[in-house]
Amino acid sequence: MLDAKRKWLLICLGLFISIFFLTVTNSPPAQKPPIKVGLLLPYTGTMPLQAKGVTDGVELYFDEIGRKAGGRPIQLFKEDTELNPTVGLTKVRRLVEDHNVNFIIGPVHSGVALAIHDYIRKQKVIQVNPTAFTRELTSPQKASENIFRVCETTDQSNFPMGMWIVKNTPHRNIVITGSDFAAGHHSVEAFKAGFEEAGGKVVKDVFPKMGTMDFAPFLTTIDVKGADAVYAWFAGTDAVRFDQQYEEFGLKKRLPLFGHNVITDDPYLASIGDAALGIITAGHYSYTLDTPENRAFVKAYQGKYGETPSRYSEFGYTAANVVGAVAEASKGEVEDIPRVAKEIKRVATKIETPAGPLAFDKYNQRITNIYVLKAEKMDGKLANVVIGKIEKVAQEDVWKWWNK
């Protein structure tokens, strides 16, 4: 009798164990924690359209991959730098210390990027800088294994543009002008170096403060004897006011206006209006670029947002692509920063962005095509139309004038 009971208990125990293991085996696996991505952008201030473009590009790419990479969901956190370096440092601390983000995409402003640089390089986080393009950030003196940049530097577009103007136009005596902060100075000074190396001469430089409302006093000083053109760097609403007042002042007819693409930025072209017509600029992207990758990007972007993408949209899209690609290649294991940093360089070479092939140099700076653009009417709408191309410009090719 006892043996029968014992057998019955053993049978029941065996059935229980079998049912338990079947249940465990057939249960869905526990979901992995999300990959956290922080957007550190100026949603308020004078550059909200830049922030919108980056954000829209990021969201489009992550939507295309189902908000998931490497088997982990992707979670976004947004912080407003207010275009203020002190605020930017506070907000990046919040992303890292409160939200524990794995990646940071941002900022836009070079001053903010420099303010957060030393903090970022000490953290277990990867920063993909979409827009801040002062040359310092990826210089040998400041480069860091966990900081990447997908926009061009101040040298990469402006230095070769100086050479392009000498080669392709009759202008040899130019006034340079830009906003009185790091990116403004570095941009027009890089242009000066390339222009003078090619045989041109800069006859004057003028640096209004960022946020200048009335450019008349500066336009008076720009109009100097012997000058035959002007090269400018102004961003956001500063560019709108400068371009409009430049034309109102009657300068454009006798002093053609050139510059970096910020002075005819796509998000601000409609506000600038016909004052933008004929301005020739250098930049890494235009939605008018005729490649299969860009046509697909423009179609998807228009389908989602009902408008054409700006260069900020491409920056954001490419930054998100870097994050998604490395997360996928790493099978979601993105916490080992040195390994992830090495993996980014490997996967980047397989990415064909809307602006062209992607690659990073040894300082984690993007090597990029630079396009010469002219503001024209296209289908009744102002657009930066591609009229020239400078291929695969690396920062090491164009920084010799200061990095000696």
Regions found by a protein language model. Give the residues of each.
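Extracytosolic ligand-binding ectodomains
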Residues: 2-404
